Amino acid sequence: MDAFDVIKTPIVSEKTMKLIEEENRLVFYVERKATKADIRAAIKELFDAEVADINTSITPKGKKKAYITLKAEYNAGEVAASLGIY
């Protein structure tokens, strides 16, 4: 699966901004069929950042969210800034 097909769009809200600042986490809508390994590879390819942990959930509307925790040596704020959301 192509990295651009896996990661659909970042989720920008007050809650996600707090996660970026305090927990070094990013939140994206991802392809519903994407596995955690697919998401990890896409983050590495698109943002050149190593992933420490991934939690996923499927919303009642059928969209899949990925909560991505970056390793300590990477800054989620810098990745968010490169996306233009921070």
From Swiss-Prot:
Cellular compartments per GO CC: ribonucleoprotein complex; ribosome
Recorded GO MF terms: rRNA binding; structural constituent of ribosome
InterPro entries: Nucleotide-bd_a/b_plait_sf (IPR012677), Ribosomal_uL23 (IPR019985), Ribosomal_uL23-like (IPR013025), Ribosomal_uL23/eL15/eS24_sf (IPR012678), Ribosomal_uL23_CS (IPR001014)
Source organism, top-level taxon: Archaea
Keyword rRNA-binding: yes
Biological process according to GO: translation
One Pfam family it belongs to: Ribosomal_L23
Keywords carried by this UniProt record: Ribonucleoprotein, Ribosomal protein, RNA-binding, rRNA-binding
Keyword Transmembrane in record: no
Function (record text): Binds to 23S rRNA. One of the proteins that surrounds the polypeptide exit tunnel on the outside of the ribosome.
Self-association and partners: Part of the 50S ribosomal subunit. Contacts protein L29.
Family: Belongs to the universal ribosomal protein uL23 family.
Protein name according to UniProt: Large ribosomal subunit protein uL23
Species of origin: Methanococcus maripaludis (strain C5 / ATCC BAA-1333)
Lineage of origin: Archaea, Methanobacteriati, Methanobacteriota, Methanomada group, Methanococci
